[in-house]
Amino acid sequence: YALAAAVNGEVFRDDEGIFTKYREILQAYYPKAVWYRKIAQTCGLFSQSGQYNLPRMRRRGQFVSAELAKVECMKHAMKLYYLLNRTYAPHDKWLFKGLPENPLMTVDHTNVTELIEKISLLPADRAHEQELTTAIESLAVIFANELEKQDIIGQCDLYLDACTKELAAKSDAL
């Protein structure tokens, strides 16, 4: 979130231009290799928390752990949204509020915000298992399609962790 703070807002005074110079470098966003690595990491964490741990914890009756996995899944979904929009993510408390302000994704941002809001309102219990799974898988579809549309990777599996190897290889090739 420090990078988001550094590039947003207004600089009131920088007589020597030192901060402005660094700020312009930061505004160019992450180098492509770093960007690919961050996308790979975030895809993996989204899958781990929402597509793997959440269903496991529910099946085991560990609903507090399931809620934690659900929250982590939402957090990583929002961070992935920022990455795909080439925008630094703000502090966690501002992640959701900033989502509509990111126009670069080819999908309508309202789909993403509505799904995240829906996930946040659903309890991570057995009674809502299908509804929660469907919402998380819908996010995975949106992100997989976006990764393909932006030509970041070839064909993306809906289990986003499967995309991490290709992203890491692209990062290493740069």
Regions of interest found by a model, annotated:
Residues 71-74, 81, 88, 92-116, ...:
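Small-residue-rich helix-loop
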Residues 1-60:
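Conserved NTP/Mg2+-binding pocket subregion across the NTase superfamily
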Residues 49-56, 114-125:
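Solvent-exposed, amphipathic alpha-helical segments
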